[in-house]
Amino acid sequence: MSSDEWSAAEDEGQLSRLLRKSRDSPFVPVGMAGFVAVLSYGLYKLNSRREQKMSLHLIHVRVAAQGCVVGAVTLGVLYSMYKDYIRPRFFNVPKK
């Protein structure tokens, strides 16, 4: 069988794919956890929003959750740039 043909044995499950991607870029689970934490806190505080409209409260929660994810992506990109370009140049570490 040629190497470009699909095989069911080579198909990985969702959990193994998530674990592999977590090893490749460790800030993905951080962003996901931050998103879930901010969203959970926002839904928890839904009853104590006082005079604020529900739609405005949900927009604020969404923006905070997206900010958490964007921050994690930014940190991941900075870490990747450091690992690929800065560390090998100054510390003579070979690339993987």
Swiss-Prot record:
Q: How does it sit in the membrane?
A: Multi-pass membrane protein
PROSITE patterns found in the cross-reference section? HIG1
From the Swiss-Prot or TrEMBL record, give the protein name: HIG1 domain family member 1C
Q: Name one GO cellular component term.
A: membrane
Name the gene behind this protein: Higd1c
List residues of the HIG1 domain. Answer: 1-91
> Which InterPro entries does the UniProt record give?
Hypoxia_induced_domain, RCF1
Its GO biological process annotations read: response to hypoxia
UniProt topological domain (Cytoplasmic) ranges: 1-26, 82-96
What ranges are annotated Extracellular (topological domains)?
A: 45-58
> What keywords are assigned to this protein?
Membrane, Transmembrane, Transmembrane helix
Where in or outside the cell? Membrane
Pfam family of the protein (one):
HIG_1_N
Q: Where are the transmembrane segments?
A: 27-44, 59-81
Its ancestry begins with: Eukaryota, Metazoa, Chordata, Craniata, Vertebrata
- Read off the PANTHER family from this record: HIG1 DOMAIN FAMILY MEMBER 1C (PTHR12297:SF10), HYPOXIA-INDUCBILE GENE 1 HIG1 -RELATED (PTHR12297)
Major subcellular location class = membrane
